[in-house]
């Protein structure tokens, strides 16, 4: 059954106009992006199959152009449309979260980066630099890869802090396993940066470890 054969009230575009985007399911929103189906499938069937292939939005968010276009019915043009929409969503999320964002509690720091970091396949060590009002003034990825105290050097962390005239900073890194429990290396890095910050007068407020929809604050755990 082609989309044009559906009643108006069941077509995704008409439903969006009549009831709002928030009322549409994920596969209906994706169908609007795809626009057309195949000879054998309506666009709604194609979008449903695409989501099933990637186990929903979680893995679709990480898909490459090659992975998308390898799926029957999804050529390069449709793959590019999907990737562009995903990137716009990330950028909008980034603007909403980072516009004079204030960090006062561990939850604030976790929420600031959870959307960006929870699905990363490698560990990313990020420093968030704050002014005297605890407003975010800059964010920098210092290191990508397995964390240890010899690789995360204080020089790289504090060079950016001094450049930005930061009053304090927060470290955030992810555990791709989804389990945010701190390792011995996590604790060692935290203590080393804390000691360096005391010497320079730039306080390490916390070290947040991001898991899958959960986090651990090393300050709350007593390591700072």
From Swiss-Prot:
NCBIfam families: PRK00024.1, radc. Residues 102-224 form the MPN domain. Zn(2+) binds at residues 173, 175, 186. GO terms for molecular function: metal ion binding; metallopeptidase activity. CDD domains: MPN_DUF2466. Keywords: Hydrolase, Metal-binding, Metalloprotease, Protease, Zinc. A motif (JAMM motif) lies at residues 173-186. It holds the Pfam family RadC. Coiled coil: none annotated. Belongs to the UPF0758 family. PANTHER family: DNA REPAIR PROTEIN RADC (PTHR30471), UPF0758 PROTEIN YEES-RELATED (PTHR30471:SF3). This is UPF0758 protein BLi02933/BL00636. InterPro entries: MPN, RadC_JAB, RuvA_2-like, UPF0758, UPF0758_CS, UPF0758_N. GO terms for biological process: proteolysis.
């Amino acid at each position: 059954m082609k989309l044009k054969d559906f009643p108006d009230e069941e077509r995704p575009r008409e439903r969006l106009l009549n009831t709002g985007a928030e009322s549409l399911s994920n596969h209906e929103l994706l169908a609007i992006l795809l626009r057309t189906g195949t000879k054998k499938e309506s666009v709604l069937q194609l979008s449903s199959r695409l989501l099933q292939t990637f186990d929903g939005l979680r893995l679709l968010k990480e898909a490459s152009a090659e992975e998308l276009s390898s799926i029957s019915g999804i050529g390069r043009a449709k793959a590019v449309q999907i990737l562009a929409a995903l990137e716009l969503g990330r950028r909008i999320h980034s603007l909403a979260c980072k516009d004079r964002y204030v960090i006062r509690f561990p939850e604030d720091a976790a929420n600031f980066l959870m959307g960006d970091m929870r699905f990363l396949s490698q560990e990313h060590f990020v420093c968030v630099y704050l002014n005297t009002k605890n407003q975010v003034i800059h964010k920098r990825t210092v290191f990508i890869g397995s964390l240890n105290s010899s690789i995360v050097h204080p020089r790289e962390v504090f060079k950016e802090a001094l450049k930005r005239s930061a009053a304090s900073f927060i470290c955030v890194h992810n555990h791709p396993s989804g389990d945010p429990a701190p390792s011995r290396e996590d604790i060692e890095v935290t203590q080393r940066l804390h000691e360096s910050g005391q010497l320079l007068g730039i306080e390490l407020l916390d070290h947040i470890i991001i898991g899958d929809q959960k986090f651990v604050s090393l300050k709350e755990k007593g390591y700072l």
